[in-house]
C-alpha cells in the first residue's frame, strides 16, 4: 500500500498541539522535525552523545510529515487541519504551509526510526522508542517506552519535559492520580514508575486514549492505569492526591475550579501547556480559588506550574 505524505511547515508555538490535530483528522502517522533539535544532545543505547544530521532538519521552524493511506486520503483533510488550527485561540500561528506527495509503505515505516532515539528527559526518566533496546539505566532511573507521533507527548517538548521534572520531584508512592489530556500517556506512565496508584488517564480524543493504552502495555502498566475518554474533569467525583494537565492555557483556566474541588487536602496540581503571556492569568486564577504556588518552571516560552491545595 502507498501513502500520501503531507509535509507541513509550522512555527514552534504550534508544535505541541499539531499531533493531536492530525490524529483527529485520521492520520496514520506523524514525524516532527524541529530545527531546535540540532541544539540538543541525545544519548545512544550505551549513553554516548551522537550527532544529528543537519540534513534531516529544517533550517528554521518545524517540519511536520503526516501520513495517510491512499485509500483513506481525502484532499479536504488540509482544510480540516486549517480549521482546527484556527480554533486554537491561545496559539500565535505565524507559519502554516503544505505540500503533498506519495511514498511507498516501506519508506513511510522507516521514517519513525530515523528521527526518534533514546534520550534522558530528566534526572529519573529516559524516553526509549519501542524498537530500541536501552541498557544504560542508572540507579534510580526509569525507562519510558513509547512510539512517537501518534499523540502528543514524547517528552521532547518543553511542556512535557517540565511536567516530567515536576512529577519526579513531587509525586510519591501510593498517591492517587488523574491525568487530564493524557495524549501519549507519558505522564501517567511516569507516575506509575514512581509507585503512584490508582491512576486515571483521560482524553477527549478516543484515538489518544487508544494510543495511551498501547503505550501503557509497552510499559507493563495497562492493568494499573484506567484510560478512558473524558472532557476535562466533568463527571469526576473521586478525590485525588495529584492532578496532571498538560493542555492549552485557556483549557487549564476552565478546569482550575474543578481541579481544586477534586483534590484532597495538600493535593497538587501539575500543569503546563501555558505560554508565558498567559502565566499571570493562570497564577491569579489558581491563587483566587485557594491554591498556593509551589513552583514555576519556564522553558522556551512555555510555563509549567505546581500548585498545592493547602489543608
Curated annotation (Swiss-Prot):
Gene source species: Macrococcus caseolyticus (strain JCSC5402)
UniProt EC number: 2.1.1.-
Superkingdom of the organism of origin: Bacteria
Function: Methylates ribosomal protein L11.
Catalytic activity, reaction form: L-lysyl-[protein] + 3 S-adenosyl-L-methionine = N(6),N(6),N(6)-trimethyl-L-lysyl-[protein] + 3 S-adenosyl-L-homocysteine + 3 H(+)
Protein known as: Ribosomal protein L11 methyltransferase
UniProt xrefs under SUPFAM superfamilies: S-adenosyl-L-methionine-dependent methyltransferases
Enzyme class: transferase
The keyword S-adenosyl-L-methionine is annotated on this UniProt entry: yes
Subcellular location: Cytoplasm
Family per similarity comment: Belongs to the methyltransferase superfamily. PrmA family.
GO biological process, any: methylation
Amino acid at each position: 500500500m502507498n501513502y500520501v505524505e503531507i509535509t507541513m511547515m509550522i512555527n514552534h508555538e504550534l508544535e505541541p498541539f499539531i499531533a493531536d490535530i492530525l490524529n483527529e483528522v485520521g492520520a496514520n502517522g506523524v514525524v516532527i522535525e524541529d530545527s531546535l533539535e540540532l541544539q540538543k544532545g541525545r544519548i545512544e543505547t550505551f549513553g554516548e552523545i551522537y550527532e544529528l544530521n543537519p540534513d534531516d532538519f529544517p533550517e528554521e521552524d518545524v517540519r511536520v510529515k503526516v501520513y495517510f493511506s491512499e485509500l483513506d486520503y481525502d484532499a479536504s483533510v488540509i482544510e480540516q487541519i486549517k480549521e482546527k488550527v484556527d480554533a486554537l485561540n491561545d496559539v500565535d500561528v505565524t507559519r502554516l504551509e503544505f505540500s503533498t506527495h506519495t511514498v511507498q509503505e516501506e519508506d513511510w515505516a522507516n521514517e519513525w526510526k530515523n528521527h526518534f532515539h533514546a534520550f534522558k528527559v530528566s534526572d529519573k526518566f529516559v524516553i526509549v522508542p519501542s524498537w530500541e533496546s536501552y541498557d544504560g539505566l542508572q540507579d534510580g532511573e526509569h525507562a519510558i517506552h513509547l512510539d512517537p507521533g501518534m499523540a502528543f507527548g514524547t517528552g521532547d517538548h518543553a511542556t512535557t519535559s517540565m511536567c516530567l521534572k515536576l512529577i519526579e520531584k513531587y509525586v510519591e508512592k501510593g498517591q492517587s492520580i488523574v491525568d487530564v489530556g493524557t495524549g501519549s500517556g507519558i505522564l501517567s506512565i511516569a507516575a506509575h514508575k514512581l509507585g503512584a496508584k490508582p491512576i486515571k488517564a483521560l482524553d477527549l480524543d478516543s484515538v489518544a486514549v487508544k494510543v495511551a493504552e498501547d503505550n501503557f502495555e509497552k510499559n507493563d502498566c495497562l492493568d494499573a492505569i484506567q484510560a478512558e475518554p473524558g472532557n476535562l474533569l466533568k463527571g469526576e467525583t473521586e478525590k485525588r492526591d495529584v492532578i496532571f494537565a498538560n493542555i492549552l492555557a485557556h483549557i487549564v483556566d476552565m478546569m482550575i475550579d474543578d481541579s481544586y474541588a477534586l483534590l484532597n487536602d495538600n493535593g497538587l496540581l501539575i500543569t503546563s501547556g501555558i505560554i508565558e503571556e498567559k502565566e499571570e492569568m493562570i497564577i491569579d486564577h489558581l491563587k483566587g480559588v485557594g491554591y498556593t504556588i509551589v513552583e514555576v518552571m519556564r522553558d522556551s516560552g512555555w510555563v509549567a506550574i505546581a500548585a498545592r491545595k493547602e489543608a
